Swiss-Prot record:
Signal sequence segment: 1-29
Catalytic activity annotation: Endohydrolysis of (1->4)-beta-D-glucosidic linkages in cellulose, lichenin and cereal beta-D-glucans
Protein name per Swiss-Prot or TrEMBL: Endoglucanase 17
Keywords recorded for this protein, A-Z: Carbohydrate metabolism, Cell wall biogenesis/degradation, Cellulose degradation, Glycosidase, Hydrolase, Polysaccharide degradation, Secreted, Signal
PROSITE patterns: GH9_1, GH9_2, GH9_3
Domain of life: Eukaryota
Name of the top EC class for this enzyme: hydrolase
Length: 516
């Protein structure tokens, strides 16, 4: 990322600090979180819970409003944001307004956006019944994504998978409301296949169709019909989208794991959404070819094998689909790999107890793994069974305790005694790597902030003037260290796919501790 060097003199730093402090009050309209009711996390009614999971749940969903692209509604709660990207898609004469910015930049990447949507939907499918007043907000967050995905898949055998030139966008530090970099549009089709992004999009639409089946049946039918056609396209024209669009999607969201995992994942969601025997047969015939038995212990926007195994295991354990019996063993293998001290455990943990997969945005694996642990524990409980790791047995309760340890670490039970969610607890990241959050809001600074002007603020040590409430950052390193530096995108950047599985986990714990 190209950075503009700025003066390091104390007088310059002081001017920037005063500048941002002024805009903090104008943009947020309240004092610092430790004294604001919006950020109050000390009103627990249940002494058994160390954390206010309900408060964290509310904020984890609110975060998505800060990532919105397009025309914002009148009930927008993240009030420092304004409309943006209103001409998206015009480069190819299509309407691609809406959707989410993936992280701290102003690009709409379809691959992680679809995964975010799938995981938000799965969170609601498994734990939405526990969310009470937050269920509607979660559905709104899902629909903001699916409305966009319907636009992106409106033409047969074509998916618009990205809006914006990431390389040019990353050379600027400007608010989404000001962005003037080229809004290039990239697509996959018969000539440039993208089975990975297409199958993930099909999974997202199918999962969302389940979410809206009762509350909005007509919309649900639209989603499911589109999911079926998009999956057919993904399966017929095989290939990774990054092979044809490499300069534009790599290294940002390259499909490193290939497309096989997404085809299995997409088929699993369509089987769940349609109950059509053809998807079950597809899985039976193609499962091994698509990597059902491959050993991998990472679940995230790139590799979906673990999620597919656990989803398919439910069909065997709870719905008694005997032909999927082998997936119980595959799912157990994944779970065994993340249980500390279990036979075949292969997951690293920090000295403070955080699951650690990689330096870049590690918290995404913490939240996704925690969600899978809780979801699998739910399935195991329903079937009155356990996890088998060699000669050892692990109960659903053990899985829940591991997930709780991870969520609690994220919320503040860690060596630094800080929350990694913005706005939760008295101490949390103040300099997140996020353009809109770090720059003065439009209400306080109506004048345009040019492409390179923003780097003066990006490189400063001043706290962000706008709170992206609920944002979970990449997190600490393998030694539990966190510098809270805006330039450190690996540790300080939030992302939609970090939050989406966390929504389900927080709903579970909020209910379990009587907060919902």
């Amino acid at each position: 990322m190209a950075l503009l060097l700025v003066s390091s003199s104390s007088s310059y730093a002081l001017r920037v600090t005063i500048f941002l402090s002024f805009f903090f009050f104008l943009c947020n309209g309240f004092s610092y979180p430790t004294t604001s009711s919006l950020f109050n996390t000390h009103h627990h009614r249940h002494h058994l819970a160390k954390h206010n999971y309900k408060d964290a749940l509310t904020k984890s969903i609110l975060f998505f409003e800060g990532q919105r692209s397009g025309k914002l509604p009148s009930n927008q709660r993240m009030s420092w944001r304004r409309d943006s990207g209103l001409s998206d898609g015009s480069a190819l004469h299509v309407d691609l307004v809406g959707g989410y910015y993936d992280a701290g930049d102003n690009i709409k990447f379809g691959f992680p956006m679809a995964f975010t949507t799938t995981m938000l939907s799965w969170s609601v499918i498994e734990f939405g019944g526990l969310m009470k007043s937050e269920l509607q907000n979660a559905k709104i967050a899902i629909r903001w994504a699916t409305d966009y995905l319907l636009k992106a898949t409106s033409q047969p055998d074509t998916i618009y998978v990205q809006v914006g030139d990431a390389n040019k966008d990353h050379s600027c530090w400007e608010r989404p409301e000001d962005m003037d970099t080229v809004r290039s549009v990239f697509k996959v089709d018969k000539n440039i296949p993208g089975s990975d992004v297409a199958a993930e999009t099909a999974a997202a639409l199918a999962a969302a169709a389940i979410v809206f089946r009762k509350s909005d049946p007509s919309y649900s039918k639209v989603l499911l019909k589109r999911a079926i056609s998009v999956f057919a396209f993904a399966d017929k024209y095989r290939g990774t989208y990054s092979a044809g669009l490499k300069p534009d999607v790599c290294p940002f969201y390259c499909s490193y794991s290939g497309y096989q995992d997404e085809l299995l994942w997409g088929a699993a969601w369509l089987q769940k959404a349609t109950k059509n025997i053809k998807y079950l047969n597809y899985i039976k015939i193609n499962g091994q070819i698509l990597g059902a038995a491959e050993y991998d212990n990472t679940f995230g926007w790139d590799n979906k094998h673990a999620g597919a195994r656990i989803l398919l295991t439910k069909a065997f354990l709870v719905q008694n689909v005997k032909t999927l019996h082998e997936y119980k063993g595959h799912a157990d293998n994944f779970i065994c790999s993340v249980i500390p001290g279990a036979p075949f455990s292969s997951t690293q943990y920090t000295p403070g107890g955080l699951l650690f997969k990689m330096a870049d945005a590690n918290m995404q694996y913490v939240t996704s793994t925690s969600f899978l642990l809780l979801t699998y524990a739910k399935y195991l409980t329903s079937a009155k069974t356990v996890v088998h790791c060699g000669g050892s047995v692990y109960t659903p309760g053990r899985l829940r305790s591991i997930a709780k340890r991870q969520v609690d670490y994220l919320l503040g039970d860690n060596p630094l005694r800080m929350s990694y969610m913005v706005g939760y607890g008295p101490k949390f990241p103040r300099r997140i790597h996020h353009r809109g959050s770090s720059l003065p809001c439009v209400a306080s600074h109506p004048a345009k902030i040019q492409c390179h002007q923003g780097f003066a603020i990006m490189n400063s040590q001043s706290p962000n003037p706008n709170f992206l409430v609920g944002a979970v950052v990449g997190g600490p390193d393998q030694h539990d260290r966190f510098p809270d530096e805006r330039s450190d995108y690996e540790q300080s950047e939030p992302a939609t796919y970090i939050n989406s599985p966390l929504v389900g986990a927080l709903a579970y714990f909020a209910h379990a501790y009587g907060q919902l």
